[in-house]
Regions:
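Divalent metal-coordination and catalytic microenvironments
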Residues: 1, 26, 37, 58, ...
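A short helix->loop->beta-strand "cap" motif at the edges of active sites that frequently abuts
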Residues: 19, 63, 150-151
Length: 231
């Protein structure tokens, strides 16, 4: 629905008989929620989810806009796939869908995609999704291109050698459950590296998620000097 007016004294005597009063006492009202990291199964993994089921699930939770990750089959790394995504999103979805493209070809962390061309087709940002750019030289090139083109880059902060075979954060719970833990440092080293690069290369940068209290401390301190987002 749409908010037409706000008032303190709304009752059946001062509204149209066609209107319905819903008691929201003790409730919260929000604008449509934006989910910035959504993995949709289309194309390639439609048995998991497609644009129609995604939009229905999102709407049931108050989400009206999603940013989709490029980890599909094929990977979203060229303009022909972007055109397909936009058509499918328009035809099948009831919500706003904004696709991202991969930072690197086939999300292999080596060769950059064509930022300028992909942006011209409606891509709003670049990320390798659940993969992290491990090579600092590659990340430097990515940031420089993002700066030149005013592109948004989104990083999954995780040193994937340190986190290899990990299931959950390392700690008491992982020990009790007998699961391989992911050490906190796996997240910290990527955040520190990228934010150090960001001090010298002023581009639009977003940390896709954080899972560590120490990461929060680092982010709070670095935000005093440089602009970036996280969450």
């Amino acid at each position: 629905g749409r908010v037409e007016a706000i008032g303190k004294k709304v009752n059946k005597n001062n509204i149209s008989s066609r209107e319905k009063i819903i008691d929201l006492n003790g409730k919260y009202i929000f604008p449509g929620i934006v989910d910035m990291k959504v993995f949709v199964g289309e194309p390639g993994y439609e048995y998991k989810e497609n644009f129609k089921t995604l939009s229905n699930a999102a709407l049931s939770g108050g989400v009206t806009t999603v940013i989709t990750m490029p980890n599909t089959d094929p990977i979203i790394d060229n303009v022909s796939i972007v055109d397909f995504l936009k058509r499918r999103g328009r035809d099948k979805s009831k919500i706003n869908i904004y696709p991202t493209a991969s930072l690197t070809k086939n999300t292999e962390g080596t060769n950059m995609t064509e930022f300028g061309l992909l942006q011209s087709k409606g891509i709003i940002g670049f990320t390798d999704g659940y993969k992290t750019i491990q090579n600092t030289r590659v990340m430097t090139r990515i940031m420089n291109s993002a700066k030149d083109l005013n592109s948004l880059i989104m990083q999954h902060a995780e040193d994937q050698e340190l986190s290899k075979n990990g299931m959950i954060n390392d700690g008491i719970i992982s020990t009790k459950l007998g699961l391989q833990g992911i050490p906190e440092i796996a997240e910290l080293v990527i955040i520190e590296r990228d934010l150090t690069l960001l001090e010298n290369i002023n581009c639009r940068y977003h940390i896709s998620q954080i899972s560590s209290g120490k990461s929060v401390e680092i982010i709070k301190k670095r935000k005093e000097k440089i602009n970036f987002s996280c969450g």
